């Protein structure tokens, strides 16, 4: 089974080797015919501490690193 990959924005980068990434998910409600935007936050592992707040990053599913970290940063574009 392929690993999930999401594109998001770094919202918090204060901890060591850890960043909080906000991912936008857009879907259409079939009943009300309305487009809904939903943000979900993921805790991701940043090995080199290279990400800053506001950076666009690609995160990929990974085996659990800690209690809440189950994602790893694959690509960071500044």
Swiss-Prot record:
NCBIfam families: PRK05610.1, uS17_bact. Keywords: Ribonucleoprotein, Ribosomal protein, RNA-binding, rRNA-binding. One of its GO terms (biological process) is translation. It holds the Pfam family Ribosomal_S17. InterPro entries: NA-bd_OB-fold (IPR012340), Ribosomal_uS17 (IPR000266), Ribosomal_uS17_bact/chlr (IPR019984), Ribosomal_uS17_CS (IPR019979). This is Small ribosomal subunit protein uS17. The keyword Thylakoid does not apply. Belongs to the universal ribosomal protein uS17 family. The lineage of its organism: Bacteria, Pseudomonadati, Pseudomonadota, Alphaproteobacteria, Rickettsiales. The gene is rpsQ.
